[in-house]
Design a protein with these regions (language model features):
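An amphipathic, aromatic/His-enriched active-site/gating alpha helix that lines ligand/cofactor pockets
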Residues: 21-37, 57-93
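Short, surface-exposed ligand-recognition loops at beta-strand->loop->(often short) alpha-helix junctions
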Residues: 9-22
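Glycine-rich beta-strand-turn "strand-cap" elements at beta-sheet edges
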Residues: 2, 40-50, 77-105
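Short, well-ordered beta-strand segments in beta-rich or mixed alpha/beta enzyme
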Residues: 3-8, 40-70
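Residue-level signal for secondary-structure boundary sites
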Residues: 14-16, 62-64, 100-102
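Short alpha-helical segments used as structural interaction elements across diverse proteins
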Residues: 1-4, 20
Length: 105
């Protein structure tokens, strides 16, 4: 299993609207892509901003390509992201999941 990690930052007052936008765009597309095993959305308040960390879980890099295209390290953005995000970080990170709930043996 592979974890794909994307990070973004919004103004604190945009948190709820951006989360709703994420659910209607990226999270919806993740769920519709073959091989997606689920997504965690983590947030934290830092000063007047909200940091978002999305951890999407995938069966394989080939499945991630079904979502992101051949250049899997490139972040995927949607049209209104630029209205919310303070910075459009161009890349994401991928990690092999070494231990997950239910797999500790």
């Amino acid at each position: 299993m592979i974890g794909r990690i994307w990070k973004g930052v919004t103004k604190k007052e945009d948190t709820k609207r951006y989360l709703a936008y994420l659910k209607a765009t990226g999270l919806k597309e993740y769920a519709a892509t073959k091989g997606n095993l689920g997504t965690y959305v983590l947030t934290q308040q830092v000063g007047g901003n909200t940091e978002f960390l999305l951890l999407s879980l995938w069966r394989s890099m080939d499945d991630i390509k079904g979502f992101a295209g051949e250049e899997v390290e490139k972040a995927v953005y949607y049209p209104a992201d630029k209205e919310f995000l303070l910075d459009m970080v161009p890349t994401v990170d991928h990690y092999e999941i070494a231990v997950a709930p239910g797999t500790q043996g």
